A protein has these predicted regions:
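Non-cysteine beta-strand/loop elements that form the S-adenosyl-L-methionine
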Residues: 57-64, 102-104, 203-212
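Glycine-rich, proline-tolerant flexible connector loops at the mouths of alpha/beta enzymes
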Residues: 31-52, 108-109
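Histidine-acidic metal/acid-base catalytic patches
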Residues: 1-26, 45, 52, 134, ...
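Catalytic domains of carbohydrate-active enzymes, especially glycoside hydrolases
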Residues: 17-35, 96-100
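Active-site-proximal loop/turn and secondary-structure-junction residues that shape catalytic pockets
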Residues: 9-11, 34-36, 64-67, 106-108, ...
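Active-site acidic/histidine proton-transfer and metal-coordination neighborhood
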Residues: 53, 72-179
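Residue-level detector of anion-binding/catalytic polar loops
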Residues: 28-29, 57, 99, 146, ...
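Conserved beta-strand positions in the central sheet of alpha/beta enzyme cores
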Residues: 31, 60, 101-102, 148, ...
Length: 268
């Protein structure tokens, strides 16, 4: 396993500055969360030169915008705007050899599903989402890029909260560029046993997001990190583990500390 960190967590006015900080702090990879409105040829050129300039590899790429999370919206215009943005991210990943992720929906849920967890897609919803997933996968077919499903907690998505629910869709599409992106923070709200869920997901797991139970850096909440990393080792996971959480203070201090904490788990 190798360490990775999400770009919004890292100080720096440019991708290059962020990557150089990460290189100094013990992270060989970066996940790029790129504001869609700020995307242009100059930023693209910087992204594609990043590894050569800094030694830090961009392994995940997502566009961020207020339209994010609406790929299955009932609003035709909003749905198409979101899908166009997702398709653009997938095309970047096809050229870069990186992973991107999608989900059925993303955003605050109203009404909040406090006492009605694990809601399931009906047959029409499932079929429509699978059709969209296959459309996204076709954009990266034949490349090293991946389009992954990330299980989100019930307060951010009404459906597909469990790793197993997402795994069933990955199995149905049966595409070599598909896979899972479990996030330990989301899992802490939905899974009764994180390690067991990871073991069951097995080789469907392509990328991992890390955040503790309070979405702080690993080791600053309630999660049993030794059992999580033991499970990843048992399934033979050798990919990237990416921090996607609060920096819990000054990142120049806390991110190097987190790298040491995670490295000890990886090598234990």
């Amino acid at each position: 396993m190798q360490l990775c960190c999400s770009s919004p967590m890292v100080p720096g006015a440019t991708l290059t500055a962020k990557a150089r900080n990460l290189q100094a702090w013990g992270y060989p990879a970066i996940a790029i969360f790129q504001p869609y409105a700020e995307w242009n040829q100059s930023v693209r050129d910087e992204l594609f030169a990043l590894e050569g300039r800094t030694g830090v590899r961009p392994v995940e790429f997502v566009f961020t915008d207020e339209i994010y999370g609406n790929a299955m919206s009932a609003d035709d215009d909003l749905r198409e705007q979101c899908r166009a943005m997702y398709r653009a991210a997938a095309q970047v990943c096809a050229d870069l050899g990186a992973a991107t992720e999608i989900e059925y929906q993303y955003g605050p849920q109203n009404p909040m599903p406090l006492f009605d967890p694990y809601q399931q897609l009906d047959s029409g919803q499932r079929a429509s989402f699978i059709d969209f997933y296959r459309e996204m996968l076709a954009l990266v077919e034949g490349t090293k890029a991946r389009v992954l499903l990330e299980p989100l907690n019930r307060y951010e998505s009404r459906y597909l909260n469990l790793v197993a629910d997402n795994a069933s869709i990955v199995d149905e599409v049966a595409h070599p560029n598909a896979g899972l992106l479990p996030d330990t923070f989301h899992m802490s709200l939905e899974e009764s046993d994180l390690a067991a869920a990871l073991r069951t997901a097995g080789d469907r797991i392509v990328h991992v997001h890390l955040g503790d139970s309070n979405r702080l850096l690993p080791g600053r909440g309630l999660l049993d990190w030794a059992s999580i990393f033991d499970a990843l080792k048992e399934i033979g996971y050798t990919g990237f583990v990416n921090l996607e959480c609060s920096t819990s203070g000054d990142p120049a201090v806390t991110l190097p500390e987190a790298a040491r904490f995670l490295h000890a788990l990886i090598t234990a």
